[in-house]
């Protein structure tokens, strides 16, 4: 059998996530990207069936109420000659752990920056995570229909704060009420902006060349002159686009536009599909796995509960690393050492699920999970592999969780363990008492847990403050030393949702003392799934 059709499918795939600070316009960009992919016909409206008002990529109840993307959705759409898998990551301040893990499942990222504000805190944190794997980054400077900071300043800030070289591909002409469009440096043409076209794909009005008198006539002599002067400076001072540096994560192409006005998004998508890598090889503990291998491999990076409230189901999101998924195929669930038959995997269009007939390396599929699949699990066509680099992060905030009705302890524990398996929260059970301590990376996670315990497990829970500053996973190669450590630190030890031994420190001083007293013991701030 010829391998050509399979290789052509894999080479078409582009799998990326959007990273940004909350409110930089990520959900709007997602909508406009889908519009260009013709996945939806009018934007504003990334809306599923049955709702006329909610953006389609935000679909849990709480997200609808608060207007934030709390869970990671996956959307697939065609663009140019590629098939794009877009992973939407939670944009809200709090939802970082899920976001970090999603970044392990993509081959490139789109960084969205609010051009009025520049580099913000959350963007820095997310960039640090992409650095762990040198992920290629494309940058979109958003909100040019508002008054923005000086574009040169923005480039300098990205370079100095995020430690990545910038190569502008387009350049803005004016901003706010004066925003006229962008000049595309690589194509030597000006694309003019029309207002009020945000919900549809704009008919492009293009002026060829920088010295074309039509440019002065359209944007006004002053702005045209300003553009020529700025470009002279920019082209002299900034980097040219370099594919090799981009693929190493050392340089980012920069596009300017307004997602709300649906302008410039297509230039960015053109760049992304032209330059971003097709599915990359991935490191397993045993060896590196190439996307073009014909045997299937994949790993689970996220578990999402109740995507369909009518069915209490959980979906495990799997990134296919190599080979092809076909309906009804047998897979080896490596952690359990068990052969499973997968006949009902799903593909995604944010909340609209359809059964996958076939999927290829680079694609994300959903497996129905009845409690046997965990984050980090590897599935193969026989080989015993474990993909590495899907981390759990030590929580930064802690609360004790308590029941209003003490008879529901069993349901509470079941609910918390399931929520911790899907990464919504981490749960710790101290060895010395029956407390249940919940750990999160952001405050909003606590609200989500209580809301979901109520709607999914019919358990009413409340929080109390607890004297915990931080948690560390404990490991020690010397069984005798570990035993001594456990005897002397009973009051500070707990088991997490996966029964891993954890040190719960009331203060950072306490943690540092414990480290000094037991140098043989490792206190880890992250744990691989």
UniProtKB/Swiss-Prot annotation:
Gene name, Swiss-Prot/TrEMBL: prfC
Keywords assigned: Cytoplasm, GTP-binding, Nucleotide-binding, Protein biosynthesis
Cellular localisation: Cytoplasm
Family stated for the protein in its record: Belongs to the TRAFAC class translation factor GTPase superfamily. Classic translation factor GTPase family. PrfC subfamily.
Main location: cytoplasm
Residues given in the record as GTP binding sites: 20-27, 88-92, 142-145
GO molecular function, one term: GTP binding
Protein's name in the database: Peptide chain release factor 3
Annotated NCBIfam families: prfC (TIGR00503), PRK00741.1 (NF001964), small_GTP (TIGR00231)
CDD domains (UniProt xref): RF3, RF3_II, RF3_III
Domain tr-type G per the UniProt entry, residue ranges: 11-280
Disulfide cysteine pairs (residue numbers): none
Organism: Vibrio vulnificus (strain CMCP6)
Superkingdom in the source lineage: Bacteria
One GO CC annotation: cytosol
One GO BP annotation of this record: regulation of translational termination
Record-linked InterPro entries: EF-G-like_DII, EFG_III/V, G_TR_CS, P-loop_NTPase, PrfC, RF3_C, RF3_dom_3_sf, RF3_GTP-bd
